[in-house]
Curated annotation (Swiss-Prot):
BP-aspect Gene Ontology terms: cellular response to nitrosative stress; nitric oxide catabolic process
GO molecular function, one term: oxygen binding
Species per Swiss-Prot/TrEMBL record: Saccharomyces cerevisiae (strain ATCC 204508 / S288c)
Extent of Basic and acidic residues compositional bias: 51-62
Miscellaneous field: Present with 195 molecules/cell in log phase SD medium.
InterPro entries in the cross-refs: Globin, Globin-like_sf, Globin/Proto, Mb-like_M
Family: Belongs to the globin family.
Highest taxon, organism lineage: Eukaryota
Region ranges (Disordered): 1-20, 51-79, 155-177, 365-406
Stated name of the protein: Uncharacterized globin-like protein YNL234W
SUPFAM superfamilies hit by this protein: Globin-like
Domain Globin: 165-298
């Protein structure tokens, strides 16, 4: 529908619009563009897909992280305020990663405004009557009666119940139709293009970014269907938060960039119809979903009671003394100390002599010399001869009387064996 224009009836308002009171005067015909066009000079939304983008979109994620955001921008984990009938409350529930720490509530009028605007985002075109109903609701006062709002009849035969009544169709059929709308909606393509315009590297870091844009729109669609009780989606949002944090590695900064791209897409689609009230409504809803996912993605931490006391302006640390293992002294063998002339030494330790002289016995037989180096060795006389003792070199052999007989027998046996084998015993 690029380039097409349809004549819509637009209500003229007087100067009392700023005070909130809108007088519905005689409608006049204007040649206006549909909300699917951008109200700026960029032209149709199809121009978002080319490289020539407006300067407001040409900035990287790093500049988004460092810039100070205005009140209309999104800062997940920081929105905890109340504006009108829409409020988001952060409840202190410790460090538990649960979406019950946040709450989002709207009144009947704002609920209808969110659902009507979401239906406009998913549709390709609007009839003049539908646009007139949405505009009347958008610029009307919150507290005026139904008689002052002829285009917002809440009766069963009213225009709103005929066009965008969320309970008019069965639940399953409506959910299936909404999924088909989200998959093929132009809003998803615009949202994806705005993400790439903010930082082209996002497509390299997250190859499934286009699929993530469609999934994000499905999450919004589920939230819009359950605005009466958003906690129905708690389990689903907790799983999404853990997946984005632990598997995809998306941090708080990623949710901030996505929030800015979402608001830019809303501005492109609604144009001048994106009032401050409608902008705050969508901002509160996105911040609620983002805060719940960020909180659910955090790993639970064990609480430890700090061991310190606060005394005035100073903090006194109390470090506990570690307990040492105590041994029983009675079970240890006590060394019996004996006094000597030089020092006191234990009595039950065996002393090893240090001045022991090593002994060496050299035996040789030269009756049948084989090598020249053995010819100079004197022979050993056999038993019974004049020299009964073996030849001993420089060493001295000390023998006891009790072992002498056994020693002679062994020597005689060795000599006899050596003579038979013609060798000497060293």
């Amino acid at each position: 529908m690029t380039g097409e224009k349809i004549l819509h009836s637009q209500l003229l308002t007087n100067s009392d619009m700023s005070s909130g009171n809108v007088h519905h005067t005689k409608p006049m015909m204007y040649n206006v563009t549909l909300p699917s066009y951008n109200s700026s000079s960029i032209g149709p939304v199809d121009n978002l897909k080319i490289n020539e983008r407006p300067g407001s979109h040409d900035h990287s994620m790093r500049s988004e992280m460092s810039s100070k955001n205005s009140g209309s921008d999104f800062m997940p984990q920081s929105i905890s305020r109340s504006e009108g009938s829409v409020y988001q409350v952060k409840i202190d529930r410790g460090d538990s990663p649960n979406t019950e720490g946040f709450d989002f509530k709207v009144n009947a009028r704002d609920l209808l405004l969110l659902r009507m605007s979401w239906d406009i985002l998913l549709r390709e075109y609007l009839t003049p009557k539908e646009l007139k109903v949405f505009q009347a609701l958008l610029y009307s006062n919150k507290h005026i009666t139904s008689t002052e709002r002829p285009y917002l009849n809440t009766a069963p035969d009213g225009m709103i119940s005929k066009t965008i009544d969320p309970t008019a169709r069965p639940r399953k059929t409506k959910q299936r139709d909404n999924d088909n709308k989200v998959d093929t909606a132009l809003f998803c393509s615009q949202f994806y293009d705005n993400l790439i315009a903010m930082d082209p590297l996002l497509e390299e870091y997250f190859p499934s970014l286009k699929h993530q844009a469609v999934s994000f729109c499905k999450v919004l669609d589920s939230a819009i269907d359950n605005l009466e009780n958003v906690h129905v989606l708690d389990d689903y949002i907790v799983k999404l938060g853990k997946r984005h944090s632990r598997i995809l590695g998306i941090k708080t900064v990623g949710f901030e960039v996505m929030g800015k791209a979402f608001m830019t897409t809303l501005q492109d689609r609604f144009g001048s119809f994106l009032t401050l009230e409608l902008k705050n409504l969508w901002g509160q809803l996105y911040s609620y979903l983002a805060n719940c996912m960020i909180t659910a993605g955090k790993d639970p931490m064990e609480k430890i009671q700090p061991d310190f006391s606060y005394n005035g302006d100073s903090v006194v640390l109390n470090f506990s003394i570690p307990k040492l293992a105590m041994h029983d002294i009675s079970t240890v063998n006590k060394l019996q100390m004996v006094k000597t002339k030089n020092a006191t030494i234990p009595h039950n330790i065996t002393q090893v002599p240090t001045n022991k002289i090593p002994t060496e016995i050299l035996l040789d037989n030269s009756s049948t010399p084989i090598k020249s180096d053995r010819e100079s060795t004197p022979p050993i006389s056999p038993k019974g001869s004049g020299s009964t003792k073996p030849s001993i070199g420089s060493s001295t052999v000390v023998e006891s009387n009790t072992k002498k007989n056994n020693y002679d027998e062994k020597i005689h046996l060795l000599q006899k064996t050596a003579q038979q084998k013609n060798c000497s015993i060293m």
